[in-house]
């Protein structure tokens, strides 16, 4: 192999190594973001259940009437 070919191969290997590292970092970040999404989804589900429960309770509440002095 010529010196120029060896340099090109080394440059390609370095590029591949950097890309592999970047892919691994992005994969880790994506996994972390999915955890956050799942936590947010669980919170939203709990809030939705609570809201629906409160809404049902408010339907059963007596109607608000005006005091006699109005």
Curated annotation (Swiss-Prot):
Task: Kindly give the InterPro entries that the UniProt entry links to this protein.
Answer: SlyX
The organism's place on the tree of life at top rank: Bacteria
| Any Pfam family matching the protein | SlyX
- Give me the disulphide-bonded residues: none
- Recorded family membership: Belongs to the SlyX family.
Q: What is this protein called?
A: Protein SlyX homolog
Q: Which organism is it from?
A: Agrobacterium fabrum (strain C58 / ATCC 33970) (Agrobacterium tumefaciens (strain C58))
